[in-house]
Structure formats: structure tokens, C-alpha cells
């Protein structure tokens, strides 16, 4: 039997809970693409008792997210805690130091520490992926880093944020006012706006 690719998720707000739901719902699809089973083993968040609309019973729980990095049943840490420093940065640094791959949707962390973290990951032969936090999940970083690596980029134009895409699409489709659509986009079930888990 092929060894599964084991994931830990830190942060169970809108994005983290959706990651858990998607991995559970699309396990077979991910296994085909990864050529081995993909499973979440462990989760972590500030409030263990909060209802997130997803079943967390199958997963081990860590109150301290940095402890995810030391677990033997984790190959990759998904960091969706948020913030440029504090627990998010400590977790990513610990994960890389422990030989774990990292996926993050944390724009602030990448903006402030992305270069140093990327260098650390590359030196260790690990993957640090931040595409989930860029351009609403469009594979823009991969296209720039791999597909256009031999070209010189001088500019990139576009709406590169999922919330902006939602707002502009809703305004165009419905004719509603900006403020009304913005308020809808800020609801927790539509967009994760400043919510930290």
C-alpha cells in the first residue's frame, strides 16, 4: 500500500474549515492526482468547541499549532491562521525546520516574510506554496514561476483578489451598488475578512 500524504490544518475559520471539507469530499480525486492517498490527520485552532459546520471528529487536535510541525503523522502543514507574525510565522518556521512542506493562504505572512521563508524551504528541499492566497486561488504564481520563468516580467495587470472578483462580478451581474455587495462579501460565509481562528 502506498504511504498516504498526510496533512495538518492550522486555523479553522472560513478557509480552514473549507479545506477540511474539500479534502474529505474529494479524497478520491486528490488520490488520483497525487498518485497516493491524501488525508488530513490533525487540526488546530484557538477555540476547540466552536461549530465550524464540518466534522472534526476524525482528526487529532493540537491546541498549540506549532506542535503540528513535530508530529510524525504530518507531511505537509496548511497554515490558514492569518497574520504576519505570531503563531502563523512560528508554525511555518517550525514546519520547515522539521522537514514539512507548507501551504499557506496567508498574504500578510508572505508579504512580510515570504522571501526568507522561500529561501529556507528551497535550501531544505521543501515546498512552500502560497498560491491559495493570491488572485483568489488562480494559479498565477505557478504560471509566473514555471511557465514564464525565462521571460522578463515588467507588469501584471488584473483583479488579483477573490473578494474583488466576487464584488465586481456581482455588481456586473445584478446592477447592485458597491456598498451593498461589499457588505455581502464581508459576511463570514462569503469571504474571510480579517477573521482569525
What are these regions (language model features)?
Residues 61-63, 78-79, 103-105, 128-132, ...:
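General beta-strand structural signal in soluble alpha/beta enzymes
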Residues 83-98, 105-146:
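Rossmann-fold NAD(P)-binding glycine/threonine-rich loop
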Residues 1-98:
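N-terminal glycine-/serine-/threonine-rich beta1-alpha1-beta2 phosphate-ribose binding loop
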Residues 20-21, 53-56, 114-117, 139-146, ...:
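Short acidic, glycine/serine/threonine-rich loops at helix termini
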Residues 57-60, 120-123, 146-149, 174:
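Short, hinge-like loop/turn segments at secondary-structure boundaries
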Residues 12, 79-81, 106-107, 132-133, ...:
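Glycine- and other small-residue-rich loops at beta-strand/loop junctions that grip anionic moieties
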Residues 10, 14, 18, 63, ...:
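Conserved active-site and cofactor/substrate-binding residues in soluble primary-metabolism enzymes
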Residues 145-197:
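Conserved anion/nucleotide-ligand pocket segment
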